[in-house]
Amino acid sequence: LEGIRLGTTLQHGKLDGHIRKDGKRTPLSLHLKGEDITFQFHTNNTWSGFHMQLQEGEAKLYETEQGKATPFPPKKIGEAIINSDVTYEDLSLRFLYWKDAEVVGEDKIKMQSCYKLRLRNPGKDGRYALVYIWVHKKYGALMQVAGYDVQGRLLKRFHVTDLMTVDKMQTLKKMNVETYEAGTNKVTGITYLEFKKPSKAKRRGL
């Protein structure tokens, strides 16, 4: 999973893009500093956001109030950002850091050979109890995600529609996030995440 985690994607230190919903674009910026990843989005002429800290192999979300970082309330982790289909746990991809990951098979996504992995939520926070991800066999890039609740009902699907090469690695450029009516195949909303290829800079890692 190391190759598809945000720490690897952000080796340049910064990634810019936007969240698009119903034709409205909201600027988005991701920054890496040590083991802290900052997510910022621009609304009403103001930048706001949250942090994800990598601690002992776990990814924990924090919000900043009056200059002090405090842990996310469990319910907030699964809340939507700026009325989109993207939640805080979706944007952070924190499930990629869950320790209970297992390869359960192989599949074809957009005619590309992929490994299918199952990840189980080690806690009770967030909306997902179980997540399946599909990783490109050749490039090691994330191709698709499906998130399920504790009752096994499908809640979300992420479809990666475009990749970009960063430091000779294939990583996320465009992704669609679909919300489903729980337990059905009915899509109730869709939001697009799009990132720009970072300009060349000094290579940075975790």
Language-model regions: role of each:
Residues 17, 37-41, 59-63, 71, ...:
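Short hydrophobic/aromatic-rich beta-strand segments that constitute the beta-sheet cores
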Residues 27-33, 50-55, 69-76, 158-160, ...:
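Short amphipathic beta-strand/extended segments with alternating polar/hydrophobic composition
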Residues 1-2, 6-12, 56-129, 149-150, ...:
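Flexible, processing/modification-adjacent segments and terminal tails
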Residues 31-35, 105-114, 165-168:
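Short, ordered beta-strand-loop transition motifs
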Residues 1-65:
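N-terminal mature ectodomain segment of secretory-pathway/periplasmic proteins
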Residues 23-27, 44-51, 62-71, 125-128, ...:
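Short, surface-exposed beta-strand/loop "edge" segments at domain boundaries and coil↔beta transitions
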Residues 112-205:
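Gly/Pro-enriched, hydrophobic low-complexity segments
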Residues 35-41, 58-61, 79-87, 143, ...:
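Short, surface-exposed linear segments at secondary-structure transitions and domain or protein termini
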